[in-house]
Structure formats: structure tokens, C-alpha cells
């Protein structure tokens, strides 16, 4: 029987694959600067020439960007997002916000489920910090800070799900999500009695993730977004009634 020779993988190939994995899973984020070459070689316990070769190949693939005298960075355009014209187009058509909410139902429900199932202690600490940041922003009545904290919180939950496709989808949708979250808070701040209810829904998601209860986390996420959707529908109905009343007044004048 003939045996084929086992070929050891080239060290630079192993380093390249490891860096690709760190980028793919989100440990190395778009725009993030890599540690200096000497430090990175020490962390990987490899020679600097092997590391340099791996980095050069990742540059050629468009995953890394080397700046003269400034270090090496993960490409900031790695997660190609929806274009600004598309975001503007969606904002000009309010009915599209319901489509986005339906999409959020699916993505955020799955993210909460797997975050409860897979989150590490570090993930949970990050989620806890952002949940607290949301509470502080709401107490101070800072709409900008609260909407930004909510977006960062959802990104942290999705990262904690440890599903690279899910994270990529969220990154692509980030401009639209930021706008949607902001618009929702503008409405909520005009009906401040709703804010405590929204907070209680979010707290249930948070507690389910922290307790490692995936089904409860997913259900809490669905209830939260269903509540937001109902508030939007109420506003739409109110606006329709107001428009009808104005039309009737105009008809009477004529």
C-alpha cells in the first residue's frame, strides 16, 4: 500500500487563516488597527517574516490596509453597507419602516436567542455596560445618546450570538437601523409615557440573555418590536384621522 507524504501547512498560511477568522468573527473590526508587527508576532509566537507574508496576502485580498508610517488596519469598507441614497429613499417613504421592523423581528429575535445560548462572560459584560448606558441616557432625557446606545447594544447582542452571517447582515443594515432607531425615539419622546414600557420590554430581553434562556430572549425581542410597531400604527391612525378632519373642515368652508 502506497502512502502519500503528509505536507505541513506553511506557517504564513496558518497566520493568514487565523487573521481571516478574527476578521470574519468580528474580533478584528472594520477600521481597527492591528498591533505593531513585533507585538503581533509575539502574540502568535511566529517569526516576523512569516507574519509579514501573511499580512501582505491579506492586503492583496483587500482585507487589510497598510498606511505608510501609520500601521496596518482592517479595511473600513469591509462590511459594505446599504448606500446613502437607499437610506434616504427609505426615509422618504415612511411605510418602508414597517418592512424594516419586520426584518428586525427576524434578525434581532435570532440574535437574542443565540446570544443567550452562546455569549461569553466578556460578551455579557459588554451587553451589561450598554444596557446601563441606555438607562442613563433615558434618565437624562438625551435622545441622541439613547438612540446611539440602543444601536450599539443591538450590535453587541448580535456579536454575542457568534454567527458571522448574522453579524454581517447587521453591519450592512447599520445605517438603516440607526435611522430607524432614531425615528422611533423621536416618536417615543413625543409620547414620553411610553418610554417606561419600552424600557421594561428591553430589560426582559437583557435579563433572558444574562440568564441563558434563549427562547425567553427571542420571545421578549418579538414582544418588544411588536410594541414599537403598534405605537407606529397608532400614530399613523391618528394622522389619518387628523387629515380627514382637516379635509372635512375645508369642505365646509367651500
From Swiss-Prot:
A biological process from GO: positive regulation of DNA-templated transcription
Pfam family of the protein (one): GntR
Annotated source species: Escherichia coli (strain K12)
Keywords recorded for this protein, A-Z: DNA-binding, Repressor, Transcription, Transcription regulation
Top-level taxonomic group: Bacteria
Molecular-function annotations in GO: DNA binding; DNA-binding transcription factor activity
Function: Transcriptional repressor for the pyruvate dehydrogenase complex genes aceEF and lpd.
PANTHER family in the cross-refs: PYRUVATE DEHYDROGENASE COMPLEX REPRESSOR, TRANSCRIPTIONAL REGULATOR, GNTR FAMILY
Keyword Transcription regulation: yes
Name this polypeptide is given: Pyruvate dehydrogenase complex repressor
Record domain HTH gntR-type: where: 9-77
DNA-binding region: 37-56
Amino acid at each position: 500500500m502506497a502512502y502519500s507524504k503528509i505536507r505541513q501547512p506553511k506557517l504564513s498560511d496558518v497566520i493568514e487563516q487565523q487573521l481571516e477568522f478574527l476578521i470574519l468573527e468580528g474580533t478584528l473590526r472594520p477600521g481597527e488597527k492591528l498591533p505593531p508587527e513585533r507585538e503581533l508576532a509575539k502574540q502568535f509566537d511566529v517569526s516576523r517574516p512569516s507574519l509579514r507574508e501573511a499580512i501582505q496576502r491579506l492586503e492583496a485580498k483587500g482585507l487589510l490596509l497598510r498606511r505608510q508610517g501609520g500601521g496596518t488596519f482592517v479595511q473600513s469598507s469591509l462590511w459594505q453597507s446599504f448606500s446613502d441614497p437607499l437610506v434616504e429613499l427609505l426615509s422618504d417613504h415612511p411605510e418602508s419602516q414597517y418592512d424594516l421592523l419586520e426584518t428586525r423581528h427576524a434578525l434581532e429575535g435570532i440574535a437574542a436567542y443565540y446570544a443567550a445560548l452562546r455569549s461569553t462572560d466578556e460578551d455579557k459584560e459588554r451587553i451589561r455596560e450598554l444596557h446601563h448606558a441606555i438607562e442613563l441616557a433615558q434618565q437624562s432625557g438625551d435622545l441622541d445618546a439613547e438612540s446611539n446606545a440602543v444601536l450599539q447594544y443591538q450590535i453587541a447582542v448580535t456579536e454575542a450570538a457568534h454567527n458571522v452571517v448574522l453579524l454581517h447582515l447587521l453591519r450592512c443594515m447599520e445605517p438603516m437601523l440607526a435611522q430607524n432607531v432614531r425615528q422611533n425615539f423621536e416618536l417615543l419622546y413625543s409620547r414620553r409615557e411610553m418610554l417606561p414600557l419600552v424600557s421594561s420590554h428591553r430589560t426582559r430581553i437583557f435579563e433572558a440573555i444574562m440568564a441563558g434562556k434563549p427562547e425567553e430572549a427571542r420571545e421578549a425581542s418579538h414582544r418588544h418590536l411588536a410594541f414599537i410597531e403598534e405605537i407606529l400604527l397608532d400614530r399613523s391612525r391618528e394622522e389619518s384621522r387628523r387629515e380627514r378632519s382637516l379635509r372635512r373642515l375645508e369642505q365646509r368652508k367651500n
